[in-house]
């Protein structure tokens, strides 16, 4: 019996929508990363992007446990000398509501060209509306 290897042009991709209202950031991010990678499918192949498209709505209402709203730090650099900038989860959510979940999922995906292709299949929206109704996404409960 030969081992099955998925080919990129044979992969069937579905669309799923996740309502993040009141959900914990890490729990949502780990399931989203798993589905973007395609590990939930029996035809998963490590070197082929077999994952699905994920639409996350109500990203502005995602929660973190404990004191992480004030204690969790996010860093970025302006590319100028001494240009490191730091913000916490609370301020990041106020300024860019979907950025925290994007960064959490991106950190859970592989680094390199395959991981960059996977993160492009993640669509995050702060409110309940999204422009992907034509794809008929199936609701996914986490």
Curated annotation (Swiss-Prot):
Key word Ribonucleoprotein present: yes
Gene3D superfamilies, alphabetized: Ribosomal protein L13
Record-linked InterPro entries: Ribosomal_uL13, Ribosomal_uL13_bac-type, Ribosomal_uL13_sf
SUPFAM superfamilies: Ribosomal protein L13
Origin: domain of life: Bacteria
Ranges that cross the membrane: none
Keyword Ribosomal protein in record: yes
Its job: This protein is one of the early assembly proteins of the 50S ribosomal subunit, although it is not seen to bind rRNA by itself. It is important during the early stages of 50S assembly.
Summary of subunit composition and partner proteins: Part of the 50S ribosomal subunit.
Name this protein carries in UniProt: Large ribosomal subunit protein uL13
Organism: Bordetella petrii (strain ATCC BAA-461 / DSM 12804 / CCUG 43448)
